[in-house]
Amino acid sequence: MNLMLTLFTNATLASLLILIAFWLPQSYAYAEKVTPYECGFDPMGSARLPFSMKFFLVAITFLLFDLEIALLLPLPWAIQATNLNLVLFMALALITLLALSLAYEWIQKGLEWVE
């Protein structure tokens, strides 16, 4: 009963949000709206600065490794196994996979800022 109530509530809420988004007026972007505003003056230069692809790749790599560590920390409590050796083996396998991934990134020069 509890599961059915939760599913019904979630489906109703999702449908309600979809209907609200459908009926709300759409805002349209036009040339004046998307141009940068600098205190009423004409812009001196382009507001669209080039984005460093190296920074983006390092940031994505950091996020992946950070999420893996965040998943590794609560592993003993999440598994709740009676066999401690199994938990230690799984944690060691995950750490080994992370170390191999880091070594691969290092060898491929994925962590270098300047070439």
From Swiss-Prot:
Core subunit of the mitochondrial membrane respiratory chain NADH dehydrogenase (Complex I) which catalyzes electron transfer from NADH through the respiratory chain, using ubiquinone as an electron acceptor. Essential for the catalytic activity of complex I. GO terms for biological process: mitochondrial electron transport, NADH to ubiquinone. PANTHER family: NADH-UBIQUINONE OXIDOREDUCTASE CHAIN 3 (PTHR11058:SF9). This is NADH-ubiquinone oxidoreductase chain 3. It is a multi-pass membrane protein. It is found in: Mitochondrion inner membrane. The keyword Membrane applies. Core subunit of respiratory chain NADH dehydrogenase (Complex I) which is composed of 45 different subunits. Interacts with TMEM186. Interacts with TMEM242. The chain crosses the membrane at residues 3-23, 55-75, 87-107. The keyword Manganese does not apply. Belongs to the complex I subunit 3 family. One of its GO terms (cellular component) is NADH dehydrogenase complex. Its main location: mitochondrion. Its EC number is 7.1.1.2. Keywords: Electron transport, Membrane, Mitochondrion, Mitochondrion inner membrane, NAD, Respiratory chain, Translocase, Transmembrane, Transmembrane helix, Transport, Ubiquinone. InterPro entries: NADH_UbQ/plastoQ_OxRdtase_su3, NDAH_ubi_oxred_su3_sf. GO terms for molecular function: NADH dehydrogenase (ubiquinone) activity. It catalyses: a ubiquinone + NADH + 5 H(+)(in) = a ubiquinol + NAD(+) + 4 H(+)(out). Gene3D superfamilies: NADH:ubiquinone/plastoquinone oxidoreductase, chain 3. Coiled coil: none annotated. It holds the Pfam family Oxidored_q4. It comes from Dugong dugon.
